Amino acid sequence: MYKRQTLYQKTDKDVSVLAVNTLGVLYLVENGDSVKSVEDLKGKTIYASGKGATPEYALNSVLKANGIDPEKDVTVEFKSEHAEVVSALVQDQTAVGLLPQPFVTTALMKNDKLKVALDLNKLWEDSMDDGSKLVTGVVIANNEFVQDHADKVNDFMDAYKESVDFVNSDTEAAAQIIGDHDIIAKEVAQKAIPDCSIVFIEGDEMKTMLSGYLATLDDQNPEIIGGQLPDDAFYYTR
């Protein structure tokens, strides 16, 4: 998600974020039953993919917020693909894996020994005191287009919200559509949708959760958000 903020800087602030469309989809999965709280991660090996991206920075933020040093108290080993994380978990029953939805659901359906130990998204919300949330995706638009076609943009946003409401209220029908279009199997989609954090959040609420999230990333590495935090013009309001 932080790439949108980088785009904001690279385009000389020619884009705005209309809404948050996906919150956190990251979960800590284990092959066992030893992790009940974030404190139980101390001394563990955590397998993950996404080095230099949201998974790494989100994990580090949650660990640090709970008094765990990512470099000293845990061993984080990055893999190139999610499937490699699952393979590592199968071989190392003392380890934990950081995986996103819907891959979590796929992995659990294929291996009944795996289980979700912790919800990184909830850990983020419990650990941060700035009203931020773990943001995975946003809707952006070119500012010139927004200014020239404000009515169309607002119609699009209304339709987008209706689509989100439909997916979350009728997961079976939504999963059927997803399966019919060969995105992922219907069975996987139906189980995964409730944990995919599909949302439509705009206005002040969007600004609060997104600005806090970007500030947390900025504390770790300003370069990943383009070197500086965005100004208020980055957040579209209608």
Predicted regions located by residue number:
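Conserved C-terminal helix/tail region of periplasmic/extracytoplasmic solute-binding proteins
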Residues: 211-238
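Short, surface-exposed acidic
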Residues: 70-74, 182-194, 225-231
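Sec/Tat-exported extracytoplasmic proteins
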Residues: 8-11, 42-45, 50, 63-67, ...
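Pocket-lining segment of extracytoplasmic ligand-binding domains
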Residues: 3, 77, 81-177
